[in-house]
């Protein structure tokens, strides 16, 4: 039997980052730490029962309950005010169906990738490991070397030792050793996520990137490369040409150049121990006021990015042509690529929740037309202003933006664009639930009617997330543009991203069906009369035909 002890909440400094959650729910690598912990245990002990302890009154979100169910682990509720020893005694007295099994215990704020397999052992570490300074300060000398993983061959002897220990786990170990000898083992691949510094050490070692990006984090510096050389050069251009007054919204740009192969372009930024908003949105428990404050900071960024003192160099940029490129040509060319790889029919009728929406092409045409009707708003455009590219500094109440686009409609290096695109990227994280798709927190539900098949996408939304989305939809980020006005662009974003996730067909399907959901909920029901967009539809059809013929 394996017990992951996570019945207390994270400490105050971590709670300020992610909200009041138990340590096993901390986000790492766009997953909950529990997912990594259980995955590692399954590698070594595939048939052992796994129990995770949680605070007695901690209410699981729908999303968290889904993770628990998928991992097939049992949950035991334990009062968060009792000691580690009392918690273990409580669990062992309840779990009466495994009287002779080995007991393996992992503290919930630890992540072990090489789990010891020996019996009756205590995992220990070298006292010189700097990330453990906090634990050495708080614990006794003997205990300070304990990593947080223990194995006991006798449940009966362990229960007896815990009962005699008077709330002290080290004392329980002493009593257990009176009966059974315990060895010390030293794992080499592990992380301690009990406090701020060590948690971010773990995060920097477990990075996430898509197939076309690569990140190296070392000595406080992030080095980024990519298979797409123009993409990296464009990001370098954006960082190096950003006006000084806007640089407070980004990490420090340190260096750029080519690697030793003389071919691969790279650039370096300072590494900031900050959480991206996507992980807070999917895995955190941050309250509504936190997100309201975050939206205020984003609005502040939009205000500075639209400052007229930065836009004097925009004379040569044709905003109409650039908007047409972003919303029309880009979407249609990406759809063409997706059509070729998937053999999907772009002209077949689509049904969502029993409503006929038209074809993918019809949806695309309408959304393009609606976006091209919006007023032009030139700004210094980030170009990929989604939650995963926004780091939040809780102490300084600042946003730090990463991974900009840096290209205009002609694929020339540029820092300029239209604010509607940045706002659409933001909405595709909040309302579009993009980060839930990337984290695998969705379900595709299929139904088959007499004349067609129908698919819907379901997200595990709780009341808190619904309130955040409601706040977002009502928030005025840019004067003269409502969030609902840019929802057609969000639909286009999901359609245009389909070929970029070719390595994950499940995500591609989710993004396509999610585009239908967004169109049905935020565009279809708000549609204006067709006569007002006929000219744009004709224009889009001409572009579409040109792309297909190319």
Language-model region placement:
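Active-site activation/catalytic loop segments of kinase-like enzymes and analogous catalytic loops
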Residues: 407-475, 491-506
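ATP-binding glycine-rich loop module of kinase domains
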Residues: 210-241, 270, 277-284
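ATP/Mg2+ or Mg2+-diphosphate-binding catalytic cores
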Residues: 458-550
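Active-site acidic catalytic loop and adjacent metal/ATP-binding pocket
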Residues: 365-417
